[in-house]
Amino acid sequence: GISTSGATPGPLAAALKAEIPGIVNSGRLSWPMEELVVLGDNAIRGSGMYADPSILSMYSLRFIYGNAVSALNEAQSVVISESMAKKLFGDNNPLGQTLKMDAKAAYSVDGAYTVTGVFRDLPANCNYRFQWLSPYETWEKANPWLQPWNNNLTETIVELSPKASPATINKKLTNYLSTKISGATNQCFLFSMNDWHLRGKFTDGVPDGGNIKYVRIFFTIAVIILLIACI
């Protein structure tokens, strides 16, 4: 059978932005990792990811402190959620303060990180509810095996221009990986973030529902209840 995954090669994001018309921005994300975040004698666990700076603008994170444009420009920087900042710093402005990240997840990077931003907590219905983000390049430097085209361990996020056609871009992507990897049989394609939660299930490479089935079930129940009420 055919398996479908969000794991892609590390170099893909930059290549797509440079080579595929209609893609105006791109960024890389690691998989979610849980770390022990330490400030003095205070330590809390928090799930986060390593991300390119462009992710901050594409995800439209709302910053309370710091600037989304530059918050992840430095190697040992970290942006944290409002709730994490509250637990560690109370009502104080944490910008410029140093946190220790104690690596508990495989391939994560421990050490001292400077707080460069605080963002509003993400809604409960987000696919990712990360509590911290640090630069992808920091993760990549510590794990150089991420760099080759034949390692699929990075999530690639792209932003299209308003006039771009996803269908047209997907046609260009059909055999794109074979131009980068000799003998590659894998294919990549765009999948809208709007569909991640409700239509994120694939069978043999073809979309096959997801949580949308529960929406349909609830809709059917609602219709039945309404029909019964009308009798």
Per-range role (PLM):
Residues 14, 34-35, 97, 156, ...:
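Residue-level detector of beta-strand structural context in well-folded domains
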Residues 6-65, 187, 191:
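Short amphipathic beta-strand/extended segments in non-transmembrane regions
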Residues 69-73:
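Glycine-rich loop motifs involved in handling phospho/adenylate chemistry
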Residues 37-40, 75-80:
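Short secondary-structure transition/capping segments
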Residues 6, 49, 78, 216-219:
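Residues that recognize and position ribonucleotide moieties
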Residues 52-65, 77-210:
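Mid-to-C-terminal secondary-structure elements
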Residues 210-231:
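Hydrophobic alpha-helical transmembrane segments of multi-pass inner-membrane transport and secretion
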